[in-house]
Amino acid sequence: MKKQYRLRKNWEFDLVLKNKKFIANKYVIVYYKKASAFKVGITVPKKFANSVGRNYHKRQMKAIVHKMNLYNYPYEMVIIIRKNFINCNFLTKVIEIEKIFTQFKQQNEKIK
């Protein structure tokens, strides 16, 4: 995933989180807000793993989002990874993230 599609600054994350719109399952929480372009930020709490482990799971999540090709959706998103995400295999992660994003797409088509 290219840098132009990432949320980087703390205040960017705060703006999305303050919007309070989210979708959750037992693996991730996805906060979102309407924006002019697609951007995503990924967080893993410190207590789940050391820095190497946290970066590993962030890379996996970036790969899943890149594979799903969500770049034409005008939303900013913050994805918070839960403990269950860390303990499952990659195939389960892909399936569960695809489910949550199809749920997100259906929910936002109703709004339009």
Swiss-Prot record:
HAMAP family: RNase_P (MF_00227). Belongs to the RnpA family. GO terms for molecular function: 3'-tRNA processing endoribonuclease activity; ribonuclease P activity; tRNA binding. The keyword Hydrolase applies. The gene is rnpA. It holds the Pfam family Ribonuclease_P. GO terms for biological process: tRNA 5'-leader removal. This is Ribonuclease P protein component. GO terms for cellular component: ribonuclease P complex. Its EC number is 3.1.26.5. It is an enzyme of class 3 (hydrolase). Keywords: Endonuclease, Hydrolase, Nuclease, RNA-binding, tRNA processing. RNaseP catalyzes the removal of the 5'-leader sequence from pre-tRNA to produce the mature 5'-terminus. It can also cleave other RNA substrates such as 4.5S RNA. The protein component plays an auxiliary but essential role in vivo by binding to the 5'-leader sequence and broadening the substrate specificity of the ribozyme. Consists of a catalytic RNA component (M1 or rnpB) and a protein subunit. It catalyses: Endonucleolytic cleavage of RNA, removing 5'-extranucleotides from tRNA precursor.
